[in-house]
Swiss-Prot record:
Protein's organism: Staurastrum punctulatum (Green alga)
Assembly and interaction partners: NDH is composed of at least 16 different subunits, 5 of which are encoded in the nucleus.
Broad class of where this protein is predominantly found: plastid
Similarity-based family: Belongs to the complex I 20 kDa subunit family.
Entry GO CC: chloroplast thylakoid membrane; respiratory chain complex I
Domain of life, source organism: Eukaryota
Protein name, entry field: NAD(P)H-quinone oxidoreductase subunit K, chloroplastic
Length: 280
């Protein structure tokens, strides 16, 4: 409440203007025309909204280069303390999280856990192209989440690669306006039905490429006939010695490789003979 200084006038001033001095406060009923400059009328919800928008505490969360732009706000050049922003390192003391940087599939459960540990009401600002859509990793990356809104609800989207500190301040101002316009009905429905906590995406599942067995193929373990003819020591004898010195758990595998090598060499020899006959 703001009280106008004109109400604090002495008794002499009232006598000069023709008002009778009174001692009982109940009979003092002076209504001024400019009452709007003297008293502020508001509701309890607007008052609490004003308190919350003036004390947003962001969580320090950064996974990529966008966090460098966010960290520059702490300096004296931009000074985001004037907006009531106090950076916190614990999610239990924060009500705002700015997801600055790329969100990977491995980091997604940790991000959801941080969001769930934040007390209500809580807000999210998606900062950067990588956070909003996956950015340059959205085409052929198997480990990047295509938008953080697949994991947690987002209140303000801040595009850029990376966004400037002035853009971050503008996003905070827009979030402050949203907080100031919230009603009591909206506060009771924080858990909206649109919020989805999932890691699903539109990528098609494919078989794993790096299975560890690519070097166990016959063509990679046994060279061709050209290399066999260039060696002074027969390659078949080398493989036989390796089978004798190997462990018993690998005998069947090595024997199978040796048989495959013999069959492949026989096929190569037949192909060479056929080519020579055709040339003749």
């Amino acid at each position: 409440m703001v009280i106008n200084s004109e109400l604090f006038r002495s008794s002499n001033s009232f006598q000069e203007e023709g008002f009778e001095s009174v001692t009982n406060g109940l009979s003092f009923s002076i209504t001024e025309e400019n009452i709007s400059d003297s008293v502020i009328l508001t509701t309890f919800h607007d008052f609490t909204n004003w308190i919350r928008l003036s004390s947003l505490w962001p969580l320090l969360y950064g996974t990529s280069c966008c966090f460098i732009e966010f960290a520059s706000l702490i300096g004296s050049r931009f000074d985001f303390d004037r907006y009531g922003l106090v950076p916190r390192s614990s999610p239990r003391q924060a009500d705002l999280i700015i997801t600055a940087g790329t969100v990977t599939m491995k980091m997604a459960p940790s991000l959801v856990r941080l969001y769930e540990q934040m007390p209500e009401p809580k807000y999210v600002i998606a900062m950067g192209a990588c956070t909003i859509t996956g950015g340059m990793f959205s085409t052929d990356s198997y480990s990047t989440v295509r938008g953080v809104d697949k994991l947690i609800p987002v209140d303000v989207y801040l595009p850029g690669c990376p966004p400037k500190p002035e853009a971050i301040i503008d996003a905070v101002i827009k979030l402050r306006k949203k907080v100031g316009q919230e009603t009591a009905h909206e506060k009771k429905n924080y858990q909206q039905s649109q919020r989805c906590f999932t890691m699903s995406h539109r990528l098609k599942p494919v078989l794993p490429i790096h299975t560890g067995t690519y070097d166990q193929q016959t063509l990679r373990r046994t060279p061709g006939i050209e290399m066999d003819t260039s060696l002074e020591y027969p390659l078949e004898r080398i493989l036989q010695n390796s089978i004798e010195t190997s462990s018993p758990f690998q005998d069947s595998e090595e024997i199978g490789l040796l048989k495959d090598w013999k069959q492949s060499n026989q096929k190569q020899e037949q192909n060479v003979k056929m080519m020579k006959e055709e040339e003749a």
